[in-house]
């Protein structure tokens, strides 16, 4: 089985995905990390190279390669504007696609930054000083990516819950079971 986690930036796809994979005994893949490895680049360089369509095509290629890997997996998917690169997988019977959703305020609370070398860091003073700007940008992202996620039927509202609680709720809501071969 493949569990896709979709959602806007900073909604919690990677953290939730890692924890869910660990709980279920599945492999975990993060599209950002897979893109960095495959194209031998940083995210900073990747997002500043080529057009959005070209970047989404490259992401689609990495999705295809990752989907060919055997075994159960949880796969966190970076927001992609050109959804053709993942829509073909949504109808597969061994795929559970979930869009993680939350309010712009809750997403803001989880907001982290990264430098040009992709090192993640928190800067709550800066973040809070620019709160209105970031809330507006998060709302724009939610609005902009809604069409991309239209075919993802499972919408999971996180309600500001902790990652541990979100994983518990996902396991219960979708009746997920551990992979006995890996646990």
Predicted feature locations:
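Hydrophobic anchor at the beta1->P-loop junction of P-loop NTPases
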Residues: 5
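P-loop (Walker A) phosphate-binding loop of NTP-binding proteins
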Residues: 8
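ATP-binding Walker
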Residues: 11
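Conserved substrate/cofactor phosphate-moiety recognition/catalytic segment
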Residues: 22-64
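NTP-dependent small-molecule kinase module
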Residues: 23, 96, 143-183
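Glycine-rich phosphate-binding loop used to anchor ATP phosphates in small-molecule kinases
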Residues: 56-94, 100
């Amino acid at each position: 089985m493949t569990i896709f986690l979709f959602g806007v930036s900073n909604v919690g796809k990677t953290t939730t995905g890692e924890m869910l994979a660990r709980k279920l005994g599945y492999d975990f893949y993060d599209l950002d990390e897979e893109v960095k490895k495959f194209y031998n680049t940083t995210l900073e360089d990747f997002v500043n190279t080529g057009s959005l369509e070209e970047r989404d095509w490259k992401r689609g290629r990495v999705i295809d390669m990752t989907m060919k890997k055997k075994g159960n997996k949880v796969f966190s998917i970076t927001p992609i504007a050109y959804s053709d690169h993942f829509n073909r997988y949504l109808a597969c019977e061994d795929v559970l696609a979930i869009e993680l959703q939350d309010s712009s305020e809750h997403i803001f609370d989880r907001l982290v930054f990264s430098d040009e070398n992709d090192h993640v860091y928190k800067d709550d003073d800066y973040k809070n000083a620019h709160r209105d700007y970031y809330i507006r940008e998060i709302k724009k992202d939610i609005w902009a990516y809604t069409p991309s996620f239209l075919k993802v039927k499972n919408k999971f509202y996180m309600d500001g819950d902790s990652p541990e609680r979100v994983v518990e709720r996902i396991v219960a809501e979708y009746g997920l079971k551990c992979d006995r071969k890996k646990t």
